[in-house]
């Protein structure tokens, strides 16, 4: 007789939830799948669309990661892989992984999260492991989520300590190593008590396999803080290098060569390179979360001047690239192709993409803007009121590379127009391509002024 598999639910099937769902569906023990996995989405139009797409074998995420695509196709063939819009399906699940978006809103910051936990409290049983993966303002779980969650559980005569509530923030990276970022990235975790921490650790080890990849914190608030500090550190470094990008042109220096020389020192090997700007769902919002904690949860007056300035600089960072391009040519009535629309390489994720904002700004300056990106569908580009360019074409007045897709590194510049201006604003082209363009007077690299 076949042993009944333990049911695991993944709440949220977006850029974090979907690969998590696929990884869990593929965990095996003794050549047998370990879990019956249920993916649950919101019961609204967007959520229903995602569920219908999965049931009809239509991907909602296009990925350059072969492993992601392999696991996705495998999941479609399994009878014990389910998707749903109904939180009542949690009743039979002993493990729940929560991967939903969290954003600061004027009046309803915690509404979606609290509503979700209200429903979870109505449907779960004792001894259920809950792992919350969402990035949150430090103090959210203990001050906002858990008190209300505990009250709702008590209505069903379940004590909070009878549920294994834990927190382990995600470090998922869309792109060519999408699945690897889940199974190989170090994880931090904590829980409301010793047993919750232990249950969380044991489950994460099913995904990671290596204990050395795990760091346990004493409290959930420490774990929440770790994610915000991690992303704030990165955002500040990006803002810092923008100052040097601006001065490098006036000094007529090759900033990229300087940075690569500095990187050889072990203490400085993670210094950032000049680029178009901050994009994606995390770095554009996460640094502000500690300010929210200070003001709304702690009711304190901490100003966080460094983080505040970094956020301001990063929001305006594309202006550095715009000024750089404008300094080389007049943009009005020019036919421009931008290569790259996602926020990072080898993904179709356009959330808060600086490339899209850059294209919109060029359009407002009177340019006729086309966008070419092998990972993005035409309708997604046209929603931004930008022309879609399906294939790379050298017959433009200006070609601007903004995202370092691997496919762009294979381009040969044989038929480029004599007067075409070519820009690399984000370290997109490889050394071979740069060498082939070295003698072209109309080729410009952000941060490299005398290469």
Question: Residues of each region from the PLM?
Answer:
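Structural/interface elements that position substrates and couple domains in central-metabolism enzymes
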Residues: 1-451
